[in-house]
């Protein structure tokens, strides 16, 4: 996942990759190889960052890959395909530690205090992808509202059901896509158990 959102050696170490006995050079090569094998994702990072910076810098609206960016009343809004918007408070364009442009905004930091935060291409894409995933899960929750849904965790839904209920029917229902996600290939898996556990 670290590679998918623009992470490099530091992100891989934070996820425990150095515990596998790999050197920094080997980790860097893994990142380089992943990026070469995934050019569309890498391009998405740069397209998203460019449009976000353009929206903030020009106090205007931009769009790429079906994602809309706008600067309104001191906020950067990123509109997802569902129409829901992510908001970044008081965005500014500032120089980052690499000498390039980054968006900073007010938010809650790791110390749980309000502070200035910096974002970057991969982090913006991570927020967008997680937002879309949330919207898809919410759509599934609505389409399965006739079921006794006892909880949901990230991309999982917990349903308490009669044994006669078909797991396949639930998975087929969860794999349905909303009109705003036309063309998305979505599949759902599931399992049955007496009490909740990780698959």
Segments and roles (model prediction):
Residues 1-199:
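Conserved catalytic core of nucleotide polymerization and phosphodiester-bond processing enzymes
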